[in-house]
From Swiss-Prot:
Main location: cytoplasm
Keywords (A to Z) from UniProt: Bacterial flagellum biogenesis, Cytoplasm, Repressor, RNA-binding, Translation regulation
Function noted in UniProt: A translational regulator that binds mRNA to regulate translation initiation and/or mRNA stability. Usually binds in the 5'-UTR at or near the Shine-Dalgarno sequence preventing ribosome-binding, thus repressing translation. Its main target seems to be the major flagellin gene, while its function is anatagonized by FliW.
Gene that encodes it: csrA
InterPro entries in the cross-refs: CsrA, CsrA_sf
Protein's UniProt name: Translational regulator CsrA
Domain of life of the organism encoding this protein: Bacteria
């Protein structure tokens, strides 16, 4: 991990198209401005971790799930 020190108003460039800038320092909180192309997905770490967990949970299925879906789409005998 690269660790850098920045002062208020200073920035960091990532690649050719992302700039991070320190916009406010208040108490124990730092506000960071991010200038990046719209096609770049930017998430807070805790949100990204929740997205990953929910995607993993949604991708899990059991044979009971398959049976339930099958019973919904299979023609029922009369």
């Amino acid at each position: 991990m690269l660790v850098l020190s920045r002062k208020l108003g200073e920035g960091i460039v990532i690649g050719d198209d992302i700039v991070l800038k320190i916009v406010e320092i208040k108490g124990g909180t730092i506000r960071i401005g991010i200038d990046a192309p719209l096609d770049k997905k930017i998430y807070r770490q805790e949100v990204y971790q929740r997205i990953i967990a929910e995607n993993q949970e949604a991708s899990q299925w059991s044979i009971d799930d398959l049976d339930a879906i099958s019973s919904l789409i299979s023609p029922q005998p009369k």
